[in-house]
Amino acid sequence: MNPIESSLLDQTTSNSVISTTLNDLSNWARLSSLWPLLYGTSCCFIEFASLIGSRFDFDRYGLVPRSSPRQADLLITAGTVTMKMAPSLVRLYEQMPEPKYVIAMGACTITGGMFSTDSYSTVRGVDKLIPVDIYLPGCPPKPEAIIDAIIKLREKIAQEISEDRNEFQQGKRYFTRKHRFHFGSSILIENKEERFFHQSYESRFESTLEITPKTSEPISEISYPFKNLKKIREVAGE
């Protein structure tokens, strides 16, 4: 799977501009850099070791094996899991940070294999202990099948990222009916402009323009102090 074809890129964007979020960028980086924790107990793990060689070169998929579960996000179990090993396996899975994934590799890990027949110490399927995302049957599976399982897991992660983005995608926003906008005349009456006024501010706007009628004269003829200040200065000879 090509990382460029993941859900990070929108088909409507141009080739030179990418519009995304920090969360999508983090998910895209996680998709292209799965760090596995290898939990091999028997012969199936020998086939996985061949992936490290130059013939298959699993580094091209961003796989970097880690020895600590706190630095891994993929657990690959290969081989038989016994009852004594079950608590350790569950503890390793719980110490891995979220999001984390599990690949069950081989028949012994998936069903217990030939060791599960009349055995008192074999776990009949690792999915009884931890959740499994990809089942890889075979005794043992070939390296090509392991690469195919990793590709299938990356496709599953990309689908989860796309579903999360569609779930939390914000739609178009409109003014609700609670705003109660209406048309009102502007102060510039000569231009006959019309603007929106909020209903809550309507009473304040009208109260500021309201004048208590102390006299019947129009507003332009009301006498103000210092109205004849210019005439007083002319008489005083200033």
Swiss-Prot record:
Q: Does the keyword Transcription regulation apply?
A: no
Any one biological process term the GO annotation gives: aerobic respiration
The EC number(s) this enzyme carries: 7.1.1.-
The UniProt entry's GO CC annotations, sorted and at most eight, read: chloroplast thylakoid membrane; respiratory chain complex I
Gene giving rise to this polypeptide: ndhK
The record's NCBIfam families line, in alphabetical order, gives: nuoB_fam (TIGR01957), PRK06411.1 (NF005012)
Q: Where does [4Fe-4S] cluster bind?
A: 43-44, 108, 139
Put simply, this protein is called NAD(P)H-quinone oxidoreductase subunit K, chloroplastic
**Example GO molecular function term?**
4 iron, 4 sulfur cluster binding
Q: Where are the transmembrane segments?
A: none
This protein's membrane topology, according to the annotation, is: Peripheral membrane protein
Which family, according to the similarity comment? Answer: Belongs to the complex I 20 kDa subunit family.
Q: By its UniProt entry, which InterPro entries does this protein fall under? A: NADH_UbQ_OxRdtase-like_20kDa, NADH_UQ_OxRdtase_20Kd_su
| Localization | Plastid, Chloroplast thylakoid membrane
What's this protein's function? NDH shuttles electrons from NAD(P)H:plastoquinone, via FMN and iron-sulfur (Fe-S) centers, to quinones in the photosynthetic chain and possibly in a chloroplast respiratory chain. The immediate electron acceptor for the enzyme in this species is believed to be plastoquinone. Couples the redox reaction to proton translocation, and thus conserves the redox energy in a proton gradient.
The chemistry this enzyme catalyses reads: a plastoquinone + NADH + (n+1) H(+)(in) = a plastoquinol + NAD(+) + n H(+)(out); a plastoquinone + NADPH + (n+1) H(+)(in) = a plastoquinol + NADP(+) + n H(+)(out)
**Could you tell me which Pfam families the record lists for this protein?**
Oxidored_q6 (PF01058)
Q: What binding details are noted for the cofactor?
A: Binds 1 [4Fe-4S] cluster.
**Enzyme class, one word?**
translocase
Subunit text? NDH is composed of at least 16 different subunits, 5 of which are encoded in the nucleus.
Cofactors per UniProt? [4Fe-4S] cluster
SUPFAM superfamilies on file: HydA/Nqo6-like
Q: Which UniProt keywords apply?
A: 4Fe-4S, Chloroplast, Iron, Iron-sulfur, Membrane, Metal-binding, NAD, NADP, Plastid, Plastoquinone, Quinone, Thylakoid, Translocase, Transport
